[in-house]
Amino acid sequence: MQPLPVEFYARQTTLVAKELLGTLLVHNSDEGITVGKIVETEAYLQGDPACHAARRMTPRNSVMFGPPGRAYVYFTYGMHYCFNVVTASEGVGEAVLIRAVEPLKGLELMRKRRGRERLHELCAGPARLVQAFGITKEHNTKELTSGPLYIAVSSEPSPEIHTTTRIGIKEGADLPLRFYIKDNKFISKK
């Protein structure tokens, strides 16, 4: 599987968020390989009140201001990690949250990591997919164009995309920056 090049990420964030739909999230860990089709994303933009980089650069969000095509993994609600992809130009401070993935390969490993059997419960939500794929804070700042964690080109045709508002935020909740593959049963919420 061919990783997406850095140029893919170095573009307008909402475009990247849409075009990530249908691509493959791949993690080749010591435990085994997991692969899933990205089916739901959210864009977080400079000046967007819900974006971690909206106010200023901090040690936590500094990766968002770095080169595109890197992982931004952060801890939220004191219990879960979330996986984002840094986008746009260096210095901008934007990213795409990967909200849901359709599990394709490494299902038994995903079930073991999640402690769940039902396929829909493995990766339908940002915290679930991070756990199922074994993504940790150690992946923060890592390049997604090479290495064990990457996003790959898919041979499937471009999916039909549905656009709506983001989930689980207060500020910027009215912005239409959530994208998902229409009629896909593995999205986190309709």
UniProtKB/Swiss-Prot annotation:
Q: Which SUPFAM superfamilies match?
A: FMT C-terminal domain-like
Instruction: Specify the domain of life of the species encoding this protein.
Output: Bacteria
Protein's GO biological process: base-excision repair
Q: What is its EC number?
A: 3.2.2.-
The record's GO molecular-function terms, alphabetically, read: alkylbase DNA N-glycosylase activity; DNA binding
Keywords attached to this entry:
DNA damage, DNA repair, Hydrolase
Q: Which NCBIfam families match?
A: 3mg, PRK00802.1-3
State the similarity comment.
Belongs to the DNA glycosylase MPG family.
Q: What is this protein called?
A: Putative 3-methyladenine DNA glycosylase
Biological classification of the source: Bacteria, Bacillati, Bacillota, Clostridia, Eubacteriales
